[in-house]
C-alpha cells in the first residue's frame, strides 16, 4: 500500500477541496514550466513531473514546458573529451559545443520527457526554436566582474511566434521546448532555458512561470537557511540581484523579466520534491518563493 492509499479518506477529501479554488483560477490559462535540475535526472522525479503535466492538461490548464539539459550536455562533453567552460552562470558555446547541445537537448532530453508525458495520453510535442520559426535569437554577452564577456553561440530570445505555440495549445498539446533558435542570419544559438522560459511566458501572456531548481527557493543571504523568503516583489529582487550566487542569477533574471513583462507571478520551486508543480499550484501554502510585481 502506498503512502497516499494509507491516508484517511477525509484527508484526501480535504486535499481535493483545497485544490478547487486554484483549479478554477487556472482553468484555461497557460502555465509555463522551466524543467531542469534533479527533476531531469532522477527517474522518480521525472515520472512525477510528466504525470503533473498530464494532470494539468486534463484539468483544462495549458502547460508549456521549456527544458534545459545542463547536466546531460556536460556529461556528453566529457564522454567526447570536450572541455566546457562557464562564465557569468552561462555555458560558453563554441560551434563544437553547440553540436553537442543540439544532439542532447532535442534528441535526448526532449525525447525522454515527451515519451514520459505521452505514457499518459497523446499530449506532448517536442519542438525547438527552429521549428515553425517558433522563436529567434539574438547573440548575447554577459558581464563578469564588470566586463562584457563573449560566451560564444549563446543567445537571448528576440521574438516568439506565439501563433505557432498557441496552435499547439489549442489542439490540446503540451509543447516541450528545447531552447535552440536561429538568429536573423540563420545561425543557431543555444539559449539559456531560464531566459527562454521567461520570454515564452511573457509572449504567451502566461498566468504563471514556474522555475524548477535544486534548492528550496530564494535565499536572500545564502547560505543562511533562515533567509529563505516565501514572497518577494520585483523591486526588492532587482536590488538583491548583484549579491546572488552566479548560478541563481539567470533564474532570478528570468523571474524579473516575466513578471515585469506582465506575467502575474513567477515561482522558484524545489524540483527535488515529488509533484512539486502540483504542490505549488494547488495548495494554499505552496512551496519555494513567489515573485510578484512591485
Swiss-Prot record:
Q: What is its EC number?
A: 2.7.2.8
Q: Subcellular location, in the record's words?
A: Cytoplasm
Show the catalytic activity: N-acetyl-L-glutamate + ATP = N-acetyl-L-glutamyl 5-phosphate + ADP
Which keywords does this chain's UniProt record carry? Answer: Amino-acid biosynthesis, Arginine biosynthesis, ATP-binding, Cytoplasm, Kinase, Nucleotide-binding, Transferase
Could you name the Gene Ontology cellular component terms for this entry? cytoplasm; peptidoglycan-based cell wall; plasma membrane
Q: Where is this site: Transition state stabilizer?
A: 34, 251
Q: Tell me if ATP-binding is a UniProt keyword of this record.
A: yes
Q: Its annotated pathway? A: Amino-acid biosynthesis; L-arginine biosynthesis; N(2)-acetyl-L-ornithine from L-glutamate: step 2/4
Which InterPro entries does the entry link to? AceGlu_kinase-like_sf (IPR036393), AcgluKinase_fam (IPR004662), ArgB (IPR037528), Asp/Glu/Uridylate_kinase (IPR001048), Glu/AcGlu_kinase (IPR001057), NAGK-C (IPR041727)
User: One short Pfam family name for this protein?
Assistant: AA_kinase
GO molecular-function term, one example from the UniProt record: ATP binding
Q: Does the keyword ATP-binding apply?
A: yes
Q: Which residues bind substrate?
A: 69-70, 91, 190
The entry's function note states: Catalyzes the ATP-dependent phosphorylation of N-acetyl-L-glutamate.
Name of this protein: Acetylglutamate kinase
Gene encoding it? argB
